[in-house]
Swiss-Prot record:
Belongs to the universal ribosomal protein uL15 family. PROSITE patterns: RIBOSOMAL_L15 (PS00475). It comes from the Bacteria. It comes from Desulfosudis oleivorans (strain DSM 6200 / JCM 39069 / Hxd3) (Desulfococcus oleovorans). This is Large ribosomal subunit protein uL15. The gene is rplO. GO terms for biological process: translation. The keyword Transmembrane does not apply. The lineage of its organism: Bacteria, Pseudomonadati, Thermodesulfobacteriota, Desulfobacteria, Desulfobacterales.
Length: 147
């Protein structure tokens, strides 16, 4: 056995069904499509989701909700995520994107209070929770709310 004479394991492959190749093949004439009718024709067959004229499922179910076109996409950053920054550094949108904490285009950044921090940082974000503000200021840092 070498690369020049490989063959599949016995029983692992199945011969393809050759349609419309004479009556002796068992799949000649109509090629397994039956006699006449919509599905026997070229391009025949119903569209996906068609249920034979019955009211389809996607129309039987009620509509729900809407998309608010004025919604703001606010990225969330927690205090514990700020451990990636050195003491005394300025943490703003650019710095957060550089560290991979904020991805893509966002309308604002909100700092939340999950976790702890032991050294001072200057944080510039558009929104901040009360607990996050207390923790940053307790560590000797400063919060600057930008719009």
């Amino acid at each position: 056995m070498d690369l020049s004479n490989l063959s599949p394991a016995p029983g692992s492959t199945k011969a393809r069904k050759r349609l419309g190749r004479g009556p002796g093949s068992g799949n000649g004439t109509t090629a397994g499509r039956g006699n006449k009718g919509h599905n026997s024709r070229s391009g025949g067959g119903v569209r996906p989701g068609f249920e034979g004229g019955q009211m389809p499922l996607h129309r039987r179910l009620p509509k729900r909700g809407f998309v608010n076109i004025f919604a703001k996409d606010i990225a969330v950053v927690n205090i514990r995520d700020l451990a990636r920054f050195e003491s005394g550094s300025v943490v703003d949108g650019e710095a957060l994107k550089a560290k991979g904490l904020v991805k893509g285009r966002v309308d604002g950044i909100k700092l939340l209070g999950k976790g702890d921090i032991a050294y001072p940082l200057t944080v510039k974000v558009s929104h901040v929770s009360r607990s996050a503000r207390e923790k940053i200021e307790a560590a000797g840092g400063a919060i600057e709310v930008i719009s």
